[in-house]
């Protein structure tokens, strides 16, 4: 491993940690706001990140819980995604990159990324439907943008995971031959 490669991996690990901490703070704030709003609905006018869902809550509590559930679940999935990325980067051995752990982590990252994408696409479609019924949904789009991009990224990561699985098979065959 060259000096530059080691530096790049350390840099990526730091960036992944920063993103992970940020996403965890966002998820925690959303969860705390949600629980607090159950006891005090007046808080709904000023949720995390200036999100105002008070009108939605007054129109339909079911829709409010559904939409907030999507917001929380997508945020939580993003936290899981970056946690898995951190585990992968911290345990990756570039001298022997084809290991069961790396293959498992890449496969898991693919599944979590696909879950984010599918959840985002479903949430987008639900928001389109409820906007036609008179709900104000303008401020919700930032919580599930790029669902299609996450699905495409999951497909690419799945291909990489498949290549790693094949690499492990070839490596074990090679070890048996020697």
Language model region names:
Residues 38-59:
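Perimembrane loop-to-helix junctions flanking transmembrane segments
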Residues 2-8, 81-105, 176-178:
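Cytoplasmic juxtamembrane regions at transmembrane-helix boundaries
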Residues 3, 114-178:
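Alpha-helical transmembrane segments of multi-pass integral membrane proteins
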Residues 34-45, 87-90, 128-137, 177:
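Transmembrane helix-loop junctions in multipass membrane proteins, especially transporters and channels
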Residues 21-37, 124-125:
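Alpha-helical transmembrane segments of multi-pass membrane proteins
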Residues 67-90, 157-169:
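Transmembrane alpha-helical segments in integral membrane proteins
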Residues 4-27, 107-110:
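Alpha-helical transmembrane segments and their helix-start/interface "positive-inside/aromatic belt" motifs
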Residues 95-127:
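Hydrophobic alpha-helical transmembrane segments of integral membrane proteins
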């Amino acid at each position: 491993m060259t000096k530059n490669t080691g530096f790049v991996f350390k840099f990526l690990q730091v960036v992944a940690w920063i993103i992970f901490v940020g996403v965890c703070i966002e998820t925690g704030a959303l969860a705390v706001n949600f629980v607090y709003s159950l006891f005090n609905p007046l808080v709904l006018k000023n949720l995390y990140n200036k999100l105002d869902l008070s009108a939605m809550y007054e129109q339909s509590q079911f829709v409010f819980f559904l939409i907030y559930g999507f917001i929380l679940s997508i945020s939580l999935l993003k936290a899981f995604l970056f946690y898995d990325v951190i585990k992968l980067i911290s345990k990756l051995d570039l001298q022997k990159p084809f290991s069961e752990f790396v293959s498992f982590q890449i496969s898991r990252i693919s599944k979590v990324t696909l879950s984010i994408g599918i959840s985002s696409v479903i949430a987008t479609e639900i928001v389109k439907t409820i906007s036609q019924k008179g709900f104000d949904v303008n401020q919700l789009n930032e919580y599930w943008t790029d669902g299609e991009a996450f699905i495409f990224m999951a497909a690419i990561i799945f291909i990489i995971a498949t290549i790693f699985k094949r690499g492990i098979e070839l490596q074990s065959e090679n070890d048996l031959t020697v």
